[in-house]
Structures are given as structure tokens and as C-alpha cells.
């Protein structure tokens, strides 16, 4: 199992200096990738976790990190596809892939925040058809010299887009979702699945099996799939319902449980630690705490 970490995009540690510092530190320590996430806004009176109160745009933050790193992969988990045109995202993703030397991974979800749907004038439904058409437009623009698409929800007149991504097939696409139909869709259509931050260990273990079974039923090799999990770390205090909690040995043991469940990449996302990614977190203290955790959990014991 590969070990990655979250990019500083939320709260106290999401500053230009700390983003560069921790991107470089993660690369030096051997982490596989850096992952960001999307949150456009929070509605007045809307109940949201502290991590969502102040969030950098993921594509811009990853571009900033790309310019200051050389080897580490750069991913977003996830962009909510109803919020942005597939043509715009195809251009952004291809540009980031080119500028990073082919290091970009694209996670896509369908969204869940009603204020964001209203503010972007979007509708997630029908989720299945929307996702499938969206993927078709992305891949056509990335791979075809002249791309065209005429769907129920998206239309693309004959057109060309350049530059193309580094990979001939475009950046790897991972799909989110927790419903069985979404899990099966990831197994059928995507490079893999990326889990929700709110998913329990049991839900993730079950999701792995559904995704793999769907891939096999579609004639794909399930061992080729990537299963990426956002790990919310609780350093210090042990909670039985949080595998990545407790002392360093307990957190590492929890990570091993994910590996045994079939997860191929786990990223420690410290944005979810309120002392690091919370809106009121002190930047200096957040940086000290994050550096301690990232250094202590460096992936020396995990290999490809």
C-alpha cells in the first residue's frame, strides 16, 4: 500500500509558505502523493465541519505545489463534477498534468452541498448518466485530435484541445461515492475509487469488494484498480472507531488494516485535524504539529 498525505489547503496551515514547506517535506520523506479537496462555500446557517470553513481552490493549490516539487504525485479528492463544465475541467486537468510532468490524479464526485448546487446553478441528477457523459467528454478532449459529443446533458461540437495531457489516455480518473451504484460505476469506468472522508472502516472494506467485483464483471482486472482512502488522523488520543488514532504505533497498525482490506493508497489528511486545518488554528502551532505527525508517519514501512 502506498502512503500519501494531504496538501495544506484548509485553515491555519493553508498559507503559501506552509504549502511549499510541507509539499517539499512530504516529497523528501518519500510520500507517494499530495491530495487536495474542493469546497466552494458554506451556506449561512449550514452545519459544516471546521475543515470546510476556509479552503483553497484545489487546482490552484496543486499547481502551486507542482512548481515546487519534482517527483511526488498531485491529486484532488474530489472535484464535484456538476459545479464545472467538463470542457473547463478538461483544460485545467491537462494543463496541470503538463506543468507537473504527468503527475496529476483526478478524483471526481457528484457533490452533496445544496448551497453549492444553488450557487453554481447545477443539478447532480441524474447522477449516473451525468457522470458517464462527463467522463466521455473529458476523455474525448484528452485523446482525440477532433473531439465531439452529443449527449442528453452535455454537448461538444467538433473541436480540438491542446496541449494534451502527458499520458496518452489522460490523467487517471478516480470516482467517489458511497452508494452501491456509485461503487459499481467506479469499478466499471474509472481507474479506481476514492473514499469519502466520512466513511467508516467497515464501509470502506465493503466498498472495496463492490468496486472490485464490478470491475471483474466488466471484464477488467480488479488488481489494476486503485483504491484511495482519505485517512483522518487523530494523533494522541485513541478512539476505537477511528483506526488512525492513538500513538504512532497504533496509527501505523491502523494503516495496515486498510492495506489488508485491499486499499492501495492511504493518505493522511491533516486538514481534518482541527488543530491544523481548523479555521482558528494558530499557523505556527499547526505547522509544528503537522511536521511532527508527517515525520513520524513517513512511509518507510510501506512499499509499492
Predicted regions span which residues?
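Alpha-helix C-terminal capping segments
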Residues: 63-71, 97-100
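Active-site beta-loop-alpha junctions enriched in small/polar residues
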Residues: 8-10, 39-41, 79-81, 109-111, ...
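N-terminal beta1-alpha1-beta2 module of alpha/beta enzyme domains
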Residues: 1-68, 171, 271, 277-296
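Active-site mouth loops of central-metabolism enzymes
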Residues: 5-17, 77-87, 167-178, 233-249
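Catalytic domains of carbohydrate-active enzymes, especially glycoside hydrolases
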Residues: 20-37, 188, 192, 255-266
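Hydrophobic faces of well-ordered beta-strands that scaffold small-molecule active sites
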Residues: 3-7, 34-36, 74-77, 104-108, ...
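Internal, glycine-rich beta/alpha segment that forms the wall or movable "lid"
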Residues: 18, 42-49, 76, 82-189, ...
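An alpha-helical appendage that flanks or caps ligand/catalytic pockets
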Residues: 27-28, 125-166, 196-304
Amino acid at each position: 500500500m502506498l502512503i500519501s498525505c494531504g496538501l495544506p489547503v484548509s485553515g491555519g496551515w493553508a498559507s503559501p509558505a506552509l504549502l511549499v514547506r510541507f509539499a517539499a517535506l512530504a516529497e523528501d520523506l518519500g510520500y507517494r502523493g499530495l491530495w487536495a479537496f474542493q469546497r466552494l462555500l458554506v451556506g449561512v446557517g449550514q452545519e459544516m465541519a471546521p475543515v470546510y470553513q476556509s479552503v483553497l481552490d484545489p487546482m490552484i493549490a496543486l499547481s502551486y505545489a507542482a512548481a515546487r516539487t519534482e517527483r511526488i504525485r498531485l491529486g484532488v479528492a474530489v472535484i464535484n463534477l456538476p459545479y464545472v463544465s467538463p470542457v473547463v475541467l478538461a483544460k485545467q486537468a491537462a494543463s496541470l498534468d503538463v506543468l507537473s510532468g504527468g503527475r496529476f490524479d483526478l478524483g471526481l464526485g457528484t457533490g452533496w452541498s445544496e448551497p453549492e448546487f444553488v450557487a453554481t446553478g447545477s443539478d447532480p441528477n441524474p447522477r449516473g448518466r451525468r457522470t458517464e457523459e462527463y467522463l466521455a467528454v473529458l476523455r474525448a478532449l484528452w485523446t482525440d485530435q477532433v473531439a465531439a459529443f452529443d449527449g442528453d446533458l452535455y454537448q461538444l461540437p467538433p473541436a480540438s484541445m491542446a496541449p494534451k495531457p502527458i499520458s496518452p489516455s489522460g490523467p487517471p480518473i478516480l470516482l467517489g461515492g458511497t452508494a452501491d451504484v456509485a461503487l459499481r460505476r467506479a469499478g466499471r469506468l474509472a481507474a479506481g475509487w476514492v473514499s469519502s472522508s466520512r466513511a467508516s472502516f467497515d464501509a470502506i472494506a465493503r466498498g472495496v469488494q463492490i468496486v472490485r467485483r464490478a470491475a471483474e464483471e466488466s471484464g477488467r482486472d480488479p488488481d489494476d484498480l486503485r483504491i484511495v482512502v482519505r485517512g483522518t488522523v487523530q494523533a494522541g488520543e485513541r478512539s476505537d472507531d477511528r483506526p488512525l488514532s492513538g500513538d504512532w504505533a497504533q496509527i501505523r497498525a491502523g494503516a495496515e488494516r486498510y492495506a489488508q482490506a485491499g486499499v492501495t493508497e492511504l493518505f493522511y489528511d491533516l486538514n481534518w485535524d482541527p488543530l491544523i486545518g481548523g479555521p482558528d488554528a494558530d499557523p505556527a502551532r499547526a505547522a509544528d504539529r503537522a511536521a511532527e505527525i508527517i515525520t513520524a508517519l513517513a512511509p518507510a514501512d510501506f512499499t509499492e
